[in-house]
C-alpha cells in the first residue's frame, strides 16, 4: 500500500469516531435522548468531553436530561472529572439547584467534598436550601473553605439567603470563621445590607471580623 493510501486508511477510524462523538454531543444538546442512547449502544465513550472539557454527564445535567444521565450512570461514566473551569458535574448541579440531579450523582459516588469551591458552597451562594440540606445529610463539610478562606455561610449571608443561613446554623456552622480578609459571615451580611441575617448571626453568637481572630 502506498504511503498516502496507508495514512488515509489509518485516519479513517479517527475521523469516523470524531463524527460519532459530534453526533452524540449534538443529540444531547438537542434533547434527543433516543438518538443519544442509540449512540451509546454503538459504543460511544461515556467519558467523551467537548472542547471546554465538559463530560457527557455534565451536559446531561446542564440540559436537564435525567433519562440520559441515568443511562450514563448505568454505564459507569466518570463523575469527578473537572472541566476547564474546574467544575465537576455535582458542582454544576448544585449551583443550579437541581436537587434530583444532585441526588443521582451523590448516590452514584460523586465526591461531595473537594478543594476550593465545594458543591455546598455553590448551592449556598445561589440560595438553594433543599440542595444545601441534602448535601449536609450526605456528609458535606459545613465549614469547608474556598481558596480565600470563605465558607458557605458567608456566601449565603452576603447574598441574602436566610433559609440557607438558618439551615447552616442549625447544622452547627461556625459563624465566626474569618477569611483571608479578616471578614466573618456577619461582615458579609452587613455588606449585603441583609439586616435580618445580621440579627440571626448575632443571635447565634456571630461577631465581626474585628473581634474574631482570622481562621488558619
Language model: regions and residue ranges:
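Conserved ankyrin/ankyrin-like repeat signature
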Residues: 35, 67-68, 100-101, 130-131, ...
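Ankyrin repeat boundary/linker residues
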Residues: 50, 83, 113-116, 146, ...
Amino acid at each position: 500500500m502506498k504511503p498516502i493510501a496507508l495514512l488515509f486508511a489509518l485516519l479513517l477510524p479517527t475521523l469516523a469516531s470524531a463524527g460519532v462523538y459530534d453526533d452524540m454531543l449534538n443529540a444531547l444538546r438537542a434533547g434527543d435522548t433516543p438518538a443519544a442512547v442509540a449512540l451509546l449502544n454503538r459504543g460511544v465513550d461515556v467519558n467523551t468531553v467537548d472542547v471546554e472539557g465538559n463530560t457527557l454527564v455534565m451536559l446531561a445535567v446542564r440540559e436537564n436530561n435525567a433519562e440520559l444521565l441515568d443511562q450514563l450512570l448505568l454505564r459507569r461514566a466518570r463523575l469527578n472529572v473537572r472541566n476547564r473551569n474546574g467544575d465537576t458535574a455535582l458542582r454544576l448541579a448544585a449551583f443550579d439547584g437541581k436537587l434530583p440531579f444532585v441526588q443521582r450523582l451523590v448516590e452514584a459516588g460523586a465526591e461531595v467534598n473537594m478543594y476550593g469551591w465545594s458543591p455546598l458552597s455553590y448551592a449556598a451562594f445561589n440560595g438553594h436550601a433543599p440542595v444545601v440540606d441534602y448535601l449536609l445529610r450526605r456528609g458535606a463539610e459545613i465549614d469547608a473553605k474556598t481558596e480565600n478562606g470563605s465558607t458557605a455561610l458567608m456566601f449565603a449571608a452576603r447574598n441574602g439567603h436566610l433559609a440557607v443561613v438558618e439551615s447552616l446554623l442549625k447544622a452547627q456552622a461556625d459563624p465566626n470563621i474569618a477569611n483571608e480578609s479578616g471578614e466573618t459571615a456577619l461582615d458579609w451580611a452587613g455588606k449585603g445590607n441583609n439586616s435580618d441575617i445580621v440579627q440571626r448571626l448575632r443571635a447565634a453568637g456571630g461577631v465581626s471580623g474585628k473581634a474574631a481572630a482570622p481562621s488558619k
